Amino acid sequence: MKKSLFIPLFIIFFSAFCFSQENKNVTLNIRVFLQGPYSNYSMSDELDKENLIPLSQPYNVNPWGYNGNEQVTKIPKDIVDWILVELTNDTNRSKIISQKAAFLRVDGKVTSLDGKNSLTFENLKEKSCYIVIQHRNHLPVMSSHSVDLDNEVHYDFTSSNQNAFDNSLVDLGNSEYGMISGDSDCNGEINKQDFRVVASNLLKVGYENADLDMNGVVNILDYKIINGNLSKRTAVR
């Protein structure tokens, strides 16, 4: 009788142990620059200074359709904008494992909602994944290789073009690299349609996707960004 009870109890205990081992919290220490607001080793936080950054994450619309409830009562200091961080399957890069909206700081650090600490993903089962960074008017980028999901991950998109899949970063000078600006219609490609979006929003002040240098106003400088990146497209999915 005792022997028959021991076997199922052992199975239950062993299964619970394995489950706890498989699920883990992983902290991502990521650095990434956006071309639009970049200047001399850092990015401008003009949108924050003008109180234009929304308190809730802006990626709940097409093409992202992210339904996360990230929001704050006040934008932390030195924040450039919201970004969307995705973890994708290491054998099927189009399959999203997990997503989180986060803040991007002027020094390129991706932070949690406090604007200080690194972003943490909870209850991950996968052993490795690709890291994807999405922004509302820059071309998405993906890590050049899958990363091991240890308790803490370090990945720097700013130090080399080879750190992005298909070398899809722009040279910012100063031996630094960033995400390509100009995708004002958020379709993953910079083309004539992006000119039309800027034209239809010309001189608007606010949190606009057509504001490609992210200074708070849509103007001729945004045309120049599109012109410099014309025909470029994302390598993500």
Model-derived regions, located:
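Bacterial Sec-dependent N-terminal signal peptides
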Residues: 1-28, 237
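Short acidic/polar inter-strand loop motif in beta-rich domains
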Residues: 135-144
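Alpha-helical segments with a strong preference for the paired helices of cellulosomal dockerin domains
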Residues: 168-173, 184-209, 215-236
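A short, solvent-exposed beta-strand micro-motif common in secreted/extracellular proteins
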Residues: 82-85, 126-136
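Short Pro-Gly-centered beta-turn/loop motif in secreted/extracellular proteins
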Residues: 77, 111-128, 137
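Short amphipathic, basic-aromatic surface patches that mediate peripheral association
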Residues: 25-76
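Solvent-exposed serine/threonine-rich low-complexity stretches and specific carbohydrate-binding patches
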Residues: 97-109
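Extracellular beta-sheet/turn segments enriched in Thr/Pro/Gly and aliphatic residues
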Residues: 24-37, 73, 148-186
